[in-house]
Amino acid sequence: MIKVVFMGTPDFSVPVLRRLIEDGYDVVGVVTQPDRPVGRKKVMTPTPVKVEAEKHGIPVLQPLKIREQDEYEKVLALEPDLIVTAAFGQIIPKEILEAPKYGCINVHASLLPELRGGAPIHYAIMQGKEKTGITIMYMVEKLDAGDILTQVEVEIEERETTGSLFDKLSEAGAHLLSKTVPLLVQGKLEPIKQDEEKVTFAYNIKREQEKINWAKTGEEVYNHIRGLNPWPVAYTTLAGQVVKVWWGEKVPTANDAQPGTIVEIQEDGFIVVTGNETGIKITELQPAGKKRMSSSQFLRGAKLEIGMKLGEDA
């Protein structure tokens, strides 16, 4: 039986681990990030992958830094024939990459060489792509640069969010891995080098990227809101306060007001001008210090007026 070590951390990784177990591989160990404090009470919380591994009685390693010798030697001591990674969250040293008989392969949530990096799902939506997918490739020390083994395309729907696409790609990754590993073991795959001229990056989202730029087109603002839903959530400012924008609809606006200006207030939302003739009707938001709510709830208590401007610094 093939001995596998799985390395992963978030919810995205769980179906991949589960599929390895269901397919009958001997998962001899799971490597995941350390428990972290979560929420206002800072409760120490295990990663979703650790929770799943413990359900199946699989030993769990949680190195703070996998590149340190005493940490990576614990992985090597498991003597895996194959290492599978999916959103592990640390750079893996060459000592691990070179050890397994069948190599170290990664389940990545984009059609490489596009969108290398830690936030490919967010960027696929923020860039308005109509499709993305899963790539399974060999791991190398350089970020997401290894030879491609298999790929599958996944459609991005008009109202797709990062949350819904995350779930679709997670399941697609598990399914593709199930087909890929037997072919890899049988030597039936021809690895394909990535075209370096087509490489793009999807680095982790920084706080300044979360703010809505109302001067962009309505389509770009709409994609921005979808791409940051449900985390970390796009935000703007209104009357000096930060407001998270959970959802908005594209609507036509024939208004020459400045981008960010409220030009119409309706029962279920308010329309904001962008950099072109497609405005955004905000229908779901979250004022600072409050819970997520519909715009109709918000409008019952808020003193909103036509001509007010969003996006001015608090």
UniProtKB/Swiss-Prot annotation:
The gene is fmt. Its EC number is 2.1.2.9. GO terms for cellular component: cytosol. One of its GO terms (molecular function) is methionyl-tRNA formyltransferase activity. The keyword tRNA processing does not apply. This is Methionyl-tRNA formyltransferase. Attaches a formyl group to the free amino group of methionyl-tRNA(fMet). The formyl group appears to play a dual role in the initiator identity of N-formylmethionyl-tRNA by promoting its recognition by IF2 and preventing the misappropriation of this tRNA by the elongation apparatus. Coiled coil: none annotated. It catalyses: L-methionyl-tRNA(fMet) + (6R)-10-formyltetrahydrofolate = N-formyl-L-methionyl-tRNA(fMet) + (6S)-5,6,7,8-tetrahydrofolate + H(+).
